[in-house]
Amino acid sequence: MNKNKFIVGLGEALWDMLPTGKKLGGAPANFAYHVSQQGLKGIAVSAVGSDALGYGIIDALKENNLDFYMQSVAYPTGVVNVELIDGKPDYHIVEDVAWDNIEFTPHMEYIARNACAVCFGSLAQRSPKSRHTVRRFIETMGVGDGIYRVFDINLRQHFYSRDVIEESLRLSNVFKINDDEIKIITPMFELTEGDYEASCRKLIAMFDLDIVILTCGEKGSFIFTNDGETSFQSTPKVDAIDTVGAGYSFTATFICGLINGKGIVAAHKAATEVAAYVCTCHGAMPEYKK
């Protein structure tokens, strides 16, 4: 594996308006940040507006020493109002914003052709334009050993459909979902209610997936592979402050572990430890302990 290749967070660039203040948010920045903390080449790809919030995102990415490709478009920069209810984030997402209008440009094609991994979700595909761009990007990456096309489903409000989820599963070879989200897709794909392993293995068979990652909060997490391997890790006991960003830190750490040559269990263990640490911090992108 060429560790100089891009590991891409593709999707929504926005501000999380938390009770504690404004924090850089969205899948691309979160994922790319945690990739960079693993010492690999994370890059955030999205779109922002030509406005103060957009310029602020660019400044924040630079302050976090993140590589990025942020298109400037004629729409306002994305904002999400985040309220913490019992420590868990509840999202109120503004519509018709910059990241709904990401173009597939020649530079994006260059990034795709030089990427070994991408993480994308359903939220950034709520608009036809950005959905088309996500699809083009993943198709341009190609397939093969060491190429990770990660669909981190990220169900938010009403911004998803079976059509988007099914197409995304067919485009991906790694699927990340949590225990709340799997309940939502169970009737869509006639999964076995309450049986996580049967459900995840059915998804592997239906969509020719290599890996399914299932996180269950305090109840631990599972990794299921297409060769029958199962890994379970319990969730470390920590004094959680909030869980914003924990999921993306988990996914980024796991994928970086595989790219660095770790096995499934070792990569899973590292992902669990990092996600637990992120839960003890304010915001999605805390500085890692050295």
Placement of each model-derived feature along the sequence:
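Glycine-rich phosphate/adenosyl-contacting loop at the front of the ribokinase-like
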Residues: M1-L66, V80, A240
